Amino acid sequence: MIPWLEADDPFPHVSSALTEADGAAGLLAAGADLSTGRLLQAYKHGIFPWFSEGQPILWWSTDPRMVLFVENFRISASLKKKLKKIHHSITSRDGQWEIRFDHAFEEVMRACAAPRNGEGGTWISDEIIAGYTGLHKLGYAHSSELWLQGKLVGAAYGVSIGQMFYGESMFARVPDASKIALAYLVHFLRNHDVSMIDCQQETSHLATLGAAPIARTEFISRLRQAVSGPQISNWQPIALFPHD
């Protein structure tokens, strides 16, 4: 059994989360709300919400935890070629490609929520969107966006607390658009002394980008130090190839 949280109840310790033997590995609690205060409390303790339509709010702390150390981010040769093409387009100001941060945060979330490849909608409900746009307005949630001829074609978004970034979701409307947006995000975070991105759950796609699972105890230890760092305030893309 997991505890049901009322509005003012604190989260249980992450060590009490269910295990694989319980049939819902990482499930910690249910209930409460998605207010900005509750979400910030959750992320600072290594907890995240994840639930489907019709379910109560479910809170998770997975073990192991999938993370991307920014120094391990993998850029394939083909992706690097695309990144250079986009870099030259941006620097020449030809009006084709643009990288923007936080220009259309809610639009990014709704694009991430849209059905993909004939599947149903994602876990990103209107309730989730409202909660995270609230964080965005307070400077705690951000998007890295790729634009082509004035249209949003790909992005990644997540939560930023101190020197910790929590990746939430990505989408692409043209090939590799989400990877390109992520590459600019990782580059920006590296330049602001962020060493680790929380990816929450293990997937083969994240592994190809350099993410790997670590023990929850190690994750929480690193997290505590990172969230106590200074909050990043100047969210502007940084050129990937400054000398080209």
Swiss-Prot record:
InterPro entries: Acyl_CoA_acyltransferase (IPR016181), Leu/Phe-tRNA_Trfase (IPR004616), Leu/Phe-tRNA_Trfase_C (IPR042203), Leu/Phe-tRNA_Trfase_N (IPR042221). It catalyses: N-terminal L-lysyl-[protein] + L-leucyl-tRNA(Leu) = N-terminal L-leucyl-L-lysyl-[protein] + tRNA(Leu) + H(+); N-terminal L-arginyl-[protein] + L-leucyl-tRNA(Leu) = N-terminal L-leucyl-L-arginyl-[protein] + tRNA(Leu) + H(+); L-phenylalanyl-tRNA(Phe) + an N-terminal L-alpha-aminoacyl-[protein] = an N-terminal L-phenylalanyl-L-alpha-aminoacyl-[protein] + tRNA(Phe). It is an enzyme of class 2 (transferase). Gene3D superfamilies: Leucyl/phenylalanyl-tRNA-protein transferase, C-terminal domain, Leucyl/phenylalanyl-tRNA-protein transferase, N-terminal domain. GO terms for molecular function: leucyl-tRNA--protein transferase activity. Pfam families: Leu_Phe_trans. Keywords: Acyltransferase, Cytoplasm, Transferase. Disulfide bonds: none annotated. The keyword Transferase applies. It comes from the Bacteria. This is Leucyl/phenylalanyl-tRNA--protein transferase. The gene is aat.
